[in-house]
Amino acid sequence: MEEEVKDIWHVYSDGTRADIPFDTTEDKVYTWNSVAISAETAGVKVLVLTINDTHLHCLTKGDTERVAHFKKVLRQRLANRFTRIHFVCNPVRTRKEAKAKFMYVYRNCLDFYKKLPGEYPWGSGNIYFSEHNSNPADHRIGDYSLREQYRMFRTRMKLPEGWMVDTYGRILSDSFIDYVSVEQLFVSVRSFIAFLYVRREDEVALKQEIHRNYLESRSIQDLRRIGNEYCVQACGKTLVKVNVRVRLAIAATMIREGIAGRSASLAKALLLKPDDLTLLI
């Protein structure tokens, strides 16, 4: 029987969205710091974090209430800078799953990054089973005035004075990422390396599972909001004012762009009958 784990969660946004919310270095710094600040606000530990141009993934540690608070604060902070971003928060049940999900997040850059994941600048870095040496160019948050901190981090919250930031103003990984819990999870360097090398078919299956969970997590209200936005863009009217043919076209677009799957929830959100979706080829 597999060993169970508690209070570990996979939090992520949609990797198939058409736009690029985290495009620039400034966008990534803001998003990175937002994860750190949201976790500190909610009393949640971050185990691993990766930010790509289109989405982010992290593994967090905390009880249900704290992780829900983390998700809410993070969504609010990102909404101040980007378009609305939907997050999924799935519990991790076993130690084996925790290791696999950790490596999925850690390796997430490999679809487009040609070096080892520990070298990816917008990932956790080489902080696990390694020494943590500060760079002379880095600074303690406590060295900045409260006014400077607000300008850099856009929060009134008092952040830990010992946290370190780099020349971009980004909070360093080993200041807020709980590498100790990760090392306890894997136990040894040998185990960490073994999980780092994932079979391609296993990674594809996990990616499909994660995307399926994302699609299933969307509420009817969320799908209807998106459907109305597409409908207004297409014909200047909301869903309630257009015919079934137009609604089906909107459904086809949302399915094609990976926003939703063929489901009763999508049909209900777009004011269709479940059988109507069978008309889509």
Regions found by a protein language model. Name each.
Residues 1-51, 63-281:
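Short Pro-Cys-Gly-centered "Cys-loop" motif that presents a nucleophilic cysteine in a tight turn
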Residues 55-63:
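Short beta-strand->loop micro-motif that forms the acidic, two-metal-ion catalytic signature
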